[in-house]
Amino acid sequence: MKTNLINKCAAVLLITICCNASLSAEAYANDQKIESFKAKDQYDVAYEFKPERMRYLLVSHDMDTGKKANAVLTTLGKDYLSNHKAAYLANIHGMPGIGRMFAIPKMKKYAHRIILGDDADLIAKFPEEVGKVTVIAISGGKVKSISYWSPGETALEDLLK
């Protein structure tokens, strides 16, 4: 009797896990509508990303790539992103608390706005190539194209035309 109950519980648990995995966010693709999202920037100021008002979204998935992207964005100036109707989202999900204690104050030194991606489901929606920043071109609130930028190796200006 106990074994039967344990087997049934295990089966229910397995089905639940499989269903949740299939419902998890899939990465955006061309012509797909991008969802609005809310997050905070490095100054702890609320930000709402509205894709219908933007032309580009840059997403760094790891700290090393983010550092390289921030170095390039700093040289381009504070208004470069806003002048190109672009936003920059840095993945901080999974960063340990002690890391945040040091990383976020460093981010405050950058003049450009850094949207802090602290939601695993949000970050999972953006395709990734290791060591590169995802650059999503947006038109009418939909993905127009997806490209990848290697900060310090290729010019961002070539992607944000």
Residue spans of the language-model regions?
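Positively charged n-region of N-terminal signal peptides that target proteins for export
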Residues: 1-8
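Bacterial N-terminal signal peptides
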Residues: 10-21
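N-proximal helix/coil linker or "cap" segments that precede and/or mark the start of modular domains
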Residues: 19-34
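A short beta-strand-turn-helix
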Residues: 37-54
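Short active-site neighborhood of thiol/selenol oxidoreductases, capturing the structured segment around
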Residues: 49-66
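Thiol/disulfide oxidoreductase modules built on the thioredoxin-like
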Residues: 50-52, 118-156
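Structural microenvironment flanking redox-active thiols in thiol-disulfide oxidoreductases
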Residues: 65-106
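Short, internal strand/loop/helix patches
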Residues: 87-89, 103-130
